[in-house]
Amino acid sequence: MKKTFYHYMMKHRAPLVKNEISDLAEAIYDDLSFPKQSEDYHEISSYLECSGLIESMSIFDKAWDLYLQER
C-alpha cells in the first residue's frame, strides 16, 4: 500500500534540526482540513496555494520530490 503525502510528511515532524520541510510538516499536521488521503500532486498543491500554509511552493516541490523517491 502506498503512503499518502500526509503520512510521508508526518515523519518530518519534530526533527532535531528544523528546516523548511519540517515546518511544512508541522503546518500540515495542525491543519484539520488538509487532504490527508490524497496522493495527487495537483490536489495538494492547489490546496496549499489557497490555504496560505506555505510561503513558497518550492518548499512543497522539494517535499514532493522526496515523497516520490520513497514511494
Curated annotation (Swiss-Prot):
Pfam families: YozE_SAM_like (PF06855). SUPFAM superfamilies: YozE-like. Belongs to the UPF0346 family. This is UPF0346 protein Bcer98_1690. It comes from Bacillus cytotoxicus (strain DSM 22905 / CIP 110041 / 391-98 / NVH 391-98). The lineage of its organism: Bacteria, Bacillati, Bacillota, Bacilli, Bacillales.
